[in-house]
């Protein structure tokens, strides 16, 4: 067992959302955990409060005494800590391999898919918690009810996100898996081949043992395409009545979704029951159906499912409501923050906002993430951004990429302006965005702050500015 051979575990890039969660679980299991990161953030502060040594920056000395070094995808081979570890013959492994090791100690439930992983993982953990199963979880966002993105439970299950962006989900060996959808994103990883993307998801499903079970969303065209090649046991879910688990009578009730769940899954009692999900959006109905499927498979009751969905307190940066902010011209606007950065998930979130607040003006502040994604999905971005009532665009968050002139925010603004419906406002520096938004907003507006980059700092700055009014 790992515990007999490994004592000290060092994380390079420990502040990353996937890394910090695994570090916390290992710390709670009794391992001596340390880590380093270029930037301080809420995750590094939280880990420090637990007694974990977090070093600012990267130097070779940080790996001294480590039995294994864990790296995130963002960490380069030239990193001085990685170089020093290899020179000292200390194993250097990717984050997903350490997650796979955690799964060896418990029954793993791995949630994969291009969109909806974090919410589905969180909903699954919430229902299993309501069922008294006390799961361990590692999530790509902060579960609001727990105040953290990871927790060591006493139960037999571990619920974790499975990351397809670098194909690292192929390291995992869960007993149950979910595929929420498949979309053409991170295509550099798959040589820009849809066939290779499909094969990766098939291989992920086949990582389960013969007694495992996958839950696959048939509302996704790409998921439907791989079904004939899946040879492990699976059940389908979706909004179509041919699915093994499906939803009808879907209704927006304010910022909640009410719907009827129908179960016609082999080996389970057939029937239907009503649920209320404490978050808006039809896409979240699908995420809830996946969590319901997993919950039924592990023996959770209908009552536990209803309790887990109604009591769900949400996830950080997934339609996260900050409440009303005061405006300089009088009145207030509701501030909502979201991680969405792909046109498909953005469209779903904007539809959720329209459904929850149908009479309100919707103002979007958006920071595109990566020049290559903006280039590859330029038309899709233009279409979805043109659906709001007012738009403020800040410059692309490069994530280490070189700028691409025809795929920056100025180009997006020009393309949207040509369509004739909106006059986008361009904000070159994201630091200027809070003040700019206060001048754009009107009483009663919904302002949606969206993106996966440095725009995540805007809500706190906007709230601070608003307090001074």
Curated annotation (Swiss-Prot):
GO MF term list: ATP binding; UDP-N-acetylmuramate-L-alanine ligase activity
Catalytic activity: UDP-N-acetyl-alpha-D-muramate + L-alanine + ATP = UDP-N-acetyl-alpha-D-muramoyl-L-alanine + ADP + phosphate + H(+)
Record-level GO cellular component terms: cytoplasm
Swiss-Prot/TrEMBL GO biological process terms: cell division; cell wall organization; peptidoglycan biosynthetic process; regulation of cell shape
Pfam families xrefs: Mur_ligase (PF01225), Mur_ligase_C (PF02875), Mur_ligase_M (PF08245)
Signal peptide: none
UniProt cross-references to InterPro entries, sorted A to Z: Mur-like_cat_sf, Mur_ligase_C, Mur_ligase_C_dom_sf, Mur_ligase_cen, Mur_ligase_N, MurCDEF_pg_biosynth, UDP-N-AcMur_Ala_ligase_MurC
Main location: cytoplasm
UniProt-annotated location(s): Cytoplasm
Keywords assigned: ATP-binding, Cell cycle, Cell division, Cell shape, Cell wall biogenesis/degradation, Cytoplasm, Ligase, Nucleotide-binding, Peptidoglycan synthesis
EC number: 6.3.2.8
Enzyme class: ligase
Residues where ATP binds: 113-119
UniProt pathway: Cell wall biogenesis; peptidoglycan biosynthesis
NCBIfam families on file: murC (TIGR01082)
PANTHER family per the UniProt record, alphabetical: UDP-N-ACETYLMURAMATE--L-ALANINE LIGASE, UDP-N-ACETYLMURAMATE--L-ALANINE LIGASE-RELATED
Its job: Cell wall formation.
Family classification: Belongs to the MurCDEF family.
Protein name (database record): UDP-N-acetylmuramate--L-alanine ligase
Name of encoding gene: murC
């Amino acid at each position: 067992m790992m515990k007999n051979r490994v004592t000290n575990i060092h994380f390079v890039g420990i502040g990353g959302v996937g890394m910090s969660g695994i570090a916390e679980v290992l710390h709670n299991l009794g391992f001596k955990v340390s880590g380093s990161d270029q930037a301080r953030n809420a995750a590094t502060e939280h880990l420090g409060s637990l007694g974990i040594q977090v070093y600012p920056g990267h130097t070779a000395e940080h790996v001294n005494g480590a039995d294994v070094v864990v790296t995130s995808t963002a960490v380069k081979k030239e990193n001085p800590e990685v170089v020093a570890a290899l020179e000292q013959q200390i194993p250097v492994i990717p984050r997903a391999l350490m997650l796979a090791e955690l799964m060896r100690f418990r029954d793993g439930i791995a949630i994969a898919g291009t969109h909806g992983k974090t919410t589905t993982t969180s909903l699954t953990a919430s229902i299993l918690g309501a069922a008294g199963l006390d799961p361990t979880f590692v999530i790509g966002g902060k579960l609001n009810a727990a105040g953290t993105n990871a927790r060591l439970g006493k139960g037999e299950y571990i619920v974790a996100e499975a990351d397809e962006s670098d194909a690292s989900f192929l390291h995992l060996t869960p007993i149950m898996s979910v595929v929420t959808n498949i979309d053409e994103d991170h295509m550099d990883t798959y040589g820009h081949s849809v066939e290779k993307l499909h094969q990766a998801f098939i291989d992920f499903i086949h990582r389960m043992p013969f007694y495992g079970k996958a839950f696959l969303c048939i509302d996704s065209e790409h998921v439907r395409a791989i079904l004939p090649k899946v040879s492990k046991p699976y059940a389908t879910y979706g909004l179509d009545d041919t699915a093994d688990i499906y939803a009808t009578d879907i209704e927006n009730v304010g910022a909640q979704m009410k719907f009827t769940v129908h179960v016609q899954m082999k080996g389970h009692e057939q029937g239907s029951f009503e649920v209320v999900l404490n978050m808006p959006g039809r896409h979240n109905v699908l995420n809830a159906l996946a969590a319901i499927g997993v919950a039924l498979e592990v023996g959770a009751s209908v009552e536990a499912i209803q309790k887990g969905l109604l009591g769900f307190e949400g996830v950080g940066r997934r339609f996260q409501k900050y409440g009303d902010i005061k405006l300089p011209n009088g009145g207030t606007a509701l501030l909502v923050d979201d991680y969405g950065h792909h046109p498909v998930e953005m469209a779903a979130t904007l539809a959720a906002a329209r459904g929850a607040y149908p009479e309100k003006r919707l103002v979007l502040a958006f920071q595109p993430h990566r020049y290559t994604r903006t280039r590859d999905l330029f038309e899709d971005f233009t279409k979805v951004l043109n659906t709001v009532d007012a738009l403020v665009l800040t410059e692309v968050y490069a994530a280490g990429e070189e700028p691409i002139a025809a795929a920056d925010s100025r180009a997006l603004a020009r393309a949207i302006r040509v369509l004739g419906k909106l006059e986008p406002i361009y904000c070159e520096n994201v630091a200027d965005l809070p003040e700019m938004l206060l001048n754009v907003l009107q009483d009663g507006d919904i302002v949606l702050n969206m993106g996966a980059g440095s725009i995540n700092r805007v809500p706190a700055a906007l709230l601070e500015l608003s307090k001074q009014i």
